[in-house]
Amino acid sequence: MTLHNNSTTSPLFPNISSSWIHSPSDAGLPPGTDTHFGSYNVSRAAGNFSSPDGTTDDPLGGHTVWQVVFIAFLTGILALVTIIGNILVIVSFKVNKQLKTVNNYFLLSLACADLIIGVISMNLFTTYIIMNRWALGNLACDLWLAIDYVASNASVMNLLVISFDRYFSITRPLTYRAKRTTKRAGVMIGLAWVISFVLWAPAILFWQYFVGKRTVPPGECFIQFLSEPTITFGTAIAAFYMPVTIMTILYWRIYKETEKRTKELAGLQASGTEAETENFVHPTGSSRSCSSYELQQQSMKRSNRRKYGRCHFWFTTKSWKPSSEQMDQDHSSSDSWNNNDAAASLENSASSDEEDIGSETRAIYSIVLKLPGHSTILNSTKLPSSDNLQVPEEELGMVDLERKADKLQAQKSVDDGGSFPKSFSKLPIQLESAVDTAKTSDVNSSVGKSTATLPLSFKEATLAKRFALKTRSQITKRKRMSLVKEKKAAQTLSAILLAFIITWTPYNIMVLVNTFCDSCIPKTFWNLGYWLCYINSTVNPVCYALCNKTFRTTFKMLLLCQCGKKKRRKQQYQQRQSVIFHKRAPEQAL
């Protein structure tokens, strides 16, 4: 904020015209008569006298006792609420791990600046108003002004950082989110404070040494180099009008981008419903299935294998490692594979926090099918017709034998709507007699025999369809949750910006008016406008609580001293989960 001073007739705002200070003697009134100084009653009772420098020695600054009580009570309450509110923010960040997000680090920095204003600036300014003069000396004056301006400018810089962070998080999720770490946030916060300190502290503390003398009169406290209204207005432009303009533009862009993502999410949900009703057809026109003609043909050629793997469905974003199942050397070398490409494809579609929703993200699942002697990943394959399916009944029987071993487990995973585990336990089945039969059987099958393979393909397609629908719903849910989080962060930002604009605008408007008319604004209005800037530090914690449920519940927990209870409940919950895990572990091993 910009404390405006350019004259010597007023202790706080020296630029105010002397026409607002009416002396009783000038008006022809007796010395005991009460008059008005701005909106304050100034008593000229006996015992009040002026010192040689023109300042009064009255400790009440010419105010009545009731006026002093009212001012002290009101400003004291505001300072106390500011201190408690911002301490709650800092402690909440410390005790609640859910609040330790990158965005909340910026709010923590803002709370620290507001706490400094509540502890130091508000109380010293109240003393200045009540006494109507500065009685703490030049060094204390310069230190107060330096701390006040650095903390206030740091608040503005933190708001700018929050606005840019929200803007880049919304508009550049792929590139910015990868760089958005707590370390980088700490660097940005440090830069905000360093810039604020460099801009104000040296000039406030050492300007009198730069120019060779101190021009601030005794009993007054203001920044020496802000002695001209034009300079004061220039600092107001740089410290308020320009940041507000930038933050408003950024918030408008954030709002438009959020609306765009909301529409795209609605389109994704609609496409999911359409795909479900149209037999799960990919937007490009290709149908998704977990079986293919090429896979069936290759399975026929490998019917002489000694051991057969089961049909596995994989849904993971990590590299798949082959099982330790013993295989022939030639098949081990030819069938080994890595699904990094599949994982990357799935990751691109599943990580809703890291990308925009586009047409390329409609391919929402990849299914890995491991059949006898073959491991591959299938994408955009068409369901084979009955004419093209030629699989020996012997091989079909061997596959069916092993499918029965996992029928209950796989069926339960699909029917219950649960996701498939990352890996199924390997249950190799020795089928020596079946293999001998397969060696002597004829590879070619008639069309009538090929129809027997249709139930297998349709079963696989049904499992794939259910699995893919579950995957689509999970991805859509993640995108929806991400959008909700972005909206909440935008709401918090909007509340903070609105409070900042409302509380800082009146004072800066008066600075603008004073540039053209230095006698148009009473001293009382200057005091109120300057105090209103301080009230912004009081309102900010309220904005956090209103817009963030986690902050709200943590505030309530701290105010009601429920930290110990919550910790005990958390420990009890963890103990129960540990018992459940140990009970389930032996069952899963069977």
Swiss-Prot record:
It is found in: Cell membrane; Postsynaptic cell membrane; Basolateral cell membrane; Endoplasmic reticulum membrane. It is a multi-pass membrane protein. It comes from Gorilla gorilla gorilla. Homodimer; the dimers can form tetramers. Interacts with NALCN. Interacts with TMEM147. CDD domains: 7tmA_mAChR_M3. A motif (Basolateral sorting signal) lies at residues 275-281. Glycans are attached at residues 5-6, 15, 41, 48. The keyword Transmembrane helix applies. Signal peptide: none annotated. Residues 323-357 are annotated as: Disordered. PANTHER family: 5-HYDROXYTRYPTAMINE RECEPTOR, MUSCARINIC ACETYLCHOLINE RECEPTOR M3. One of its GO terms (cellular component) is plasma membrane. One of its GO terms (molecular function) is acetylcholine binding. Belongs to the G-protein coupled receptor 1 family. Muscarinic acetylcholine receptor subfamily. CHRM3 sub-subfamily. This is Muscarinic acetylcholine receptor M3. Residues 334-345 have a biased composition (Low complexity). One of its GO terms (biological process) is positive regulation of smooth muscle contraction. The gene is CHRM3. SUPFAM superfamilies: Family A G protein-coupled receptor-like (SSF81321). The chain crosses the membrane at residues 68-91, 105-130, 143-164, 185-206, 230-252, 492-514, 527-546. Disulfide bonds join 141-221, 517-520. Residues 1-67, 131-142, 207-229, 515-526 are extracellular. Residues 92-104, 165-184, 253-491, 547-590 are cytoplasmic.
